[in-house]
Swiss-Prot record:
Tissue localization of expression: Root specific.
Full protein name: Probable xyloglucan endotransglucosylase/hydrolase protein 5
Signal peptide residue numbers: 1-21
Pfam families in the record: Glyco_hydro_16 (PF00722), XET_C (PF06955)
Family: Belongs to the glycosyl hydrolase 16 family. XTH group 1 subfamily.
Gene that this polypeptide is encoded by: XTH5
Superkingdom of the source species: Eukaryota
Keyword Iron: no
Residues that coordinate or bind xyloglucan: 110, 123-125, 133-135, 199-200, 204, 279
Class of the enzyme per the UniProt entry, highest EC level: transferase
Organism: Arabidopsis thaliana
Amino acid sequence: MGRLSSTLCLTFLILATVAFGVPPKKSINVPFGRNYFPTWAFDHIKYLNGGSEVHLVLDKYTGTGFQSKGSYLFGHFSMHIKMVAGDSAGTVTAFYLSSQNSEHDEIDFEFLGNRTGQPYILQTNVFTGGAGNREQRINLWFDPSKDYHSYSVLWNMYQIVFFVDDVPIRVFKNSKDVGVKFPFNQPMKIYSSLWNADDWATRGGLEKTNWEKAPFVASYRGFHVDGCEASVNAKFCETQGKRWWDQKEFQDLDANQYKRLKWVRKRYTIYNYCTDRVRFPVPPPECRRDRDI
């Protein structure tokens, strides 16, 4: 009976892996100071539990932020965040990667606060060679202020995938063969910040920050970085092709992951530059490859 139970359990695990796709590797809990340091308004960052948890605080005087100590070419970058609760209109919590030059590459998560009872909006964007204008917006299918959720980026030579709790919400494929630049030779640092953006963040700036609700707090956990660390001037990753994120199963989404992406597209997407015919009468070439049109 014991051997039969073990066999059934193993079979279930194999079938579950096939059914739900291959998720990125889970991050390891390490303290904030291992990989990050504050960059401004140091007194607005609070450290808890030996640095395993960090709170960013925004008031009417300033927000705050932090960045990674290292720069990275490819990897899996995640953060567990609990967003500002209650009336968060006008606030933006950002988690992103960016290189440090004028023709920079950038991969963005921006969480746009809202009035109490209204959904948070998650805006993503990708900059290549200094050019962005690739905004996509979704409503999250949960309240991100109630608990910690994982937000992550898988970046390799083949694709950039945005995940929310291991659900792919966006893909940006390497489309250099059709003339679209792709981030591949500019190391990026990891950044996060909480700041006031009530000139645009909520309903295009119509909803202003209610400072009577301050201070606003965004909470963070999970400061492990799983990336190819490189100097800011490096042009390639020395371990290219050898890390888990380079392997075949991470070079494209599988059928089930595309199904989940389609679910997000159908039920939660509220803006997609790929389908905006006012801004782009002819869809950008990457959109068809990314299955966004």
